[in-house]
Design a protein with these regions (language model features):
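FAD-binding beta-loop-beta segment adjacent to the flavin cofactor pocket
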Residues: 82-127
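Short, hydrophobic alpha-helical segments
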Residues: 147-158
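A helicase ATPase "motif cassette" and its flanking acidic/Ser/Thr-rich regulatory loops
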Residues: 139
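Short, flexible loop/turn segments with low-complexity composition
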Residues: 14-17, 156-172
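Acidic-aromatic/histidine active-site loop/patch
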Residues: 143
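Class I S-adenosyl-L-methionine
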Residues: 1-77, 81-83
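Short Lys/Arg-rich cationic patches that frequently serve as NLS/NoLS or arginine-rich RNA/DNA-binding motifs
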Residues: 168-183
Length: 183
């Protein structure tokens, strides 16, 4: 959601969400580690539980369950609850093998932090906290692109005066506002 103050920007500022970049998109498999630690493989007990839980809700007509991610496709959404059982994004390991969860490095790559997180040691918190933080995060490239579009709209209302950057008052504004001073 992007909002602008009507008193400053009017009823319909010329904001446009950024276009999706052209060209090939990365696949889910491109973020996966070749030999992840075994601790990320679901136990027989957890895998059985998730399958029973999904079947119970499927019978009721609900959409609850787990999500198996196709390495050749795109990922499902990583949420802050991922640390609990990883059920939103489970990685297929082959027939008769329990799926696995994302590693912390893979979760970082998925959310756009691949340049900052090369190894597990680059994340100074527990797995639980890392999954929560990555799951609550917004992909930095998306925030950057939306932020640039917001700045374009803001530039239409900016006036340089005596070394200060001021937002111009909308002439149709009902109430007078003090100019915002930024550094």
């Amino acid at each position: 959601i992007v909002c602008f103050d009507r008193d400053v920007f009017g009823d319909c500022p010329d904001f446009r969400f950024p276009e999706t970049p052209e060209g090939p998109r990365p696949t889910f498999g491109s973020i996966l580690e070749p030999a992840p630690p075994e601790k990320y493989i679901l136990t027989d007990r957890l895998w059985d539980y998730l399958q029973r839980y999904a079947e119970k809700h499927r019978a009721k007509g609900n959409g609850f369950g787990f999500g198996l991610a196709n390495p050749d496709g795109v990922s499902r959404t990583l949420s802050a609850r991922y640390y609990k059982d990883g059920s939103e994004i489970l990685i297929v390991r082959g027939k008769r093998k329990n799926p696995r969860r994302l590693t912390i490095v893979e979760a970082a790559r998925l959310m756009g932090y691949g340049e900052l997180v090369k190894t597990r040691d680059d994340v100074p918190v527990s797995d639980t906290q890392a999954y929560r933080q990555f799951g609550n995060s917004v992909v930095p490239l998306v925030v950057t692109a939306v932020g640039r579009q917001i700045l374009e709209v803001m530039k239409t209302r900016i006036d340089d005066e005596k070394g200060f950057t001021l937002l111009k008052q909308n002439p149709r504004s009902k109430r007078r506002r003090k100019a915002l001073r930024t550094s």
